[in-house]
Amino acid sequence: MSVAMDTYPITPGSEPRPLFQVTDAVIEVLRRGGADLSQLGVPAQPEPEDGLWEKVSVPQARALKNIWTNSMKEAAHDDYLRWRLDDLDPLQKPNTLRNWLDSLVQAKERKGRPETLNLIVPGNVGTGKTTALAALGNEASERGLVTRFVKHATYLAWRRPDGSPDDLRAYQVRKRHVEADLLILDELCGEMDGIATEFARRETIDLVDSRLAAGRATAFSTNLKSRGAPGKPPGIADILGDRFLSRIEARAHLVTIQGPDRRKPHKPLDW
């Protein structure tokens, strides 16, 4: 007995493809996402002479932007991605931040070390320090710098066993934060009200020392003073030690942001 089989014509261009064949359409999707196409045997675009990937049409530039965006999302700071230095008010020192960013970009162009490696941004609560540094990071990621954002307490939590996100190992967490061209370490000592544990001191000093040795820039924000005073909250040196304070003050620029608490309601809540 024979069985009749229906046959259908195949439209040209829609023929079945060999298993695991990567089509041009798939490559374009991966390219837009900033994937490393060299893993698929696709030749990489030539490295720019100045070492900077700035054009968003270039996959590497989109990859740099994705690194920054993902770090902001991990910090639940999606809303801060809209800020640029031109949006800041004079109290947030946009011109100083822009000049420092220019120096970082110029250093990478000439494959050298920035003259000022650390930017320390202290100030009272709610003055817009995080907003200012987010604007700095937004523009840095668009100017060819590998830029990451992380809160100090979050970094320490990620360095603990089984504490890292996305199935990363602890050494991978350290690697990604040590190797960034610009690291924004937000709320330094933000959840510490006394002498830090040996773990916190060791991990923080290791991060800062490694970045200094590699010539990579770090911006710190904090609500604390460098040192505490009688009857006042402890300062950075009181919590992490004089050795750490000397590390971040070396080759540093101070940008103090003071002013009213921007998050405080204009009318006090009665409750």
Give the residues covered by each predicted segment.
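A short, basic N-terminal segment
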Residues: 1-99, 254, 263-271
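Short glycine-rich substrate-engagement loop in P-loop NTPases that contacts/grips substrate
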Residues: 97-101, 137, 141-179, 198
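Walker A/P-loop nucleotide-binding motif
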Residues: 112-133
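Loop/turn-to-beta-strand initiation segments
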Residues: 145-146, 179-182, 214-220
